[in-house]
Amino acid sequence: VSVNSVICITRGFFNFMVRKGYYDENPVRDVPFLRKNVVAPFIFSPQQTDRLLTALLTRIRKKPSCYLKDLTIYMAILLLARCGMRISEPLRLLVEHYRPEEKSLYIENTKFKKDRLIPLPMAVATEIDNYLQVRESLLGTSQNPYLLPGFRLSRLLDQKVRDAFHQAVKAIGLARPRQVIGNTVFAKPTPHSLRHSFAVNTLKKIKQRGKSPQHALPVLAAYMGHVEYRSTAYYLKFLDAEQREKLASFVASHPKPS
């Protein structure tokens, strides 16, 4: 329970006591709510995203018993980075959800109980095609229905993706702790940071092409599976990774006087 929740409940209790005549006025009427912290998500630049994916590729073990496992984890993170997916979405994909002729993925029953069909960047579709060829050569006619298989007939585990992500982030020197400076929370890199980064970097590219990011926002929202484009706008607290890094450095070097 948050401090603000306690204040709200206590204020309501004393309002009741005032109505019953036990108090003349509410003793906590003027107690202010705490200011909510502003969260500054970690943003990867396009170059940092490329480095992260390269680091994951170099960590793929060539041993036959490990190769497909490591490649599967890489594919999951690739879809987070290049398609802005939530971490649960690639892990729940079935083989039949990939449509090679259309170069698209059908994402079913997402966070808001919505389905969506997304076109894939050509490079991503090529990687999926190559992955499926490797999978078939190593697993043969496997009965595992998941596009990204785990042990036996199960899907790839969320924690394996997170572990590989954090190892790669550390390997490229981008590991950062979560910091609270004043009323701003500077979040550490997480797999969800790739979704934030996808939104920020996509709109930046659109602006660089001379197009309107505002007009593109509803399309981006639909692609990312948001019910309202305002949910996507929530991700856009920074213009790019550089602006976020400059703010973090500035706030850290200019602490509030005590």
Q: Where does each model-flagged region fall?
A:
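Conserved catalytic core of the tyrosine transesterase superfamily
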Residues: 1-258
